[in-house]
């Protein structure tokens, strides 16, 4: 990477926050100020995701030849400059994506508008998690001729019987697998702090998502004076499954499905400050989510 790559990325952020947003309405409700606030928050906050584009150029300049790119598909922001860079600098290559998450009805980024697929950066082939998702992703607007039914490559480690993970884990415990959203993390941690007073014997482990703002998370933990925990960032999520007694989640993560598949006690918690992106919402899963600290306490009991 060169200095010019970083300067161009900063310029991209500056252009992003200067895109005019006016007269954005939901029926008669003006949402322009809300969209502007999000625009200012995101303009420079996600610049690191753009660096993959010039990185691909540097790889091309260095003489690399790449026939195929493989990546985990969630239709998130970092995937767009990645696909654009692949097609720009390695036009003869194929981009193959494998589905890495569930599809949530309330997460608009997982759906394409009418004819949006004609210009939206999309992989050449998307390996779906089974035949059901052929219809799910097709109905979400993705080109049906690019969808292929296949195995869920994320779950291959579910069949592993052994692990080299040897961290000394305190028991009994609860694990909080945080997602990409700081607000969801704050809601979960604040409720768990209250609940932990009722169960002092349960040790708390927090697993941070790589897209979280760690500095802001640390500030929140200090603000609420929550310090009796350890981070569970070491090892894979599958490593922690065999060392965890209870998992608590505010949604927005396929870890919920993995937890159920492994037979680990799971408590789904509806957040008070965001949408509840629950991958089990469309299933007949018999245990309903909870919301308040009192409900969580009853669920733990």
Label the predicted regions.
Residues 139, 148-222, 230-231, 290:
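Conserved catalytic-core segment of nucleotide-activated headgroup transferases in glycan assembly
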Residues 1-2, 40-47, 51-54, 61-149, ...:
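Active-site-proximal region of nucleotide-activated glycan assembly enzymes
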Residues 1, 67-68, 71-75, 125, 129-131, 173, 177-181, 203, ...:
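Structural motif
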Residues 138-149, 224, 246, 251-301:
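Catalytic binding pocket for nucleotide-activated donors in carbohydrate/polymer assembly enzymes
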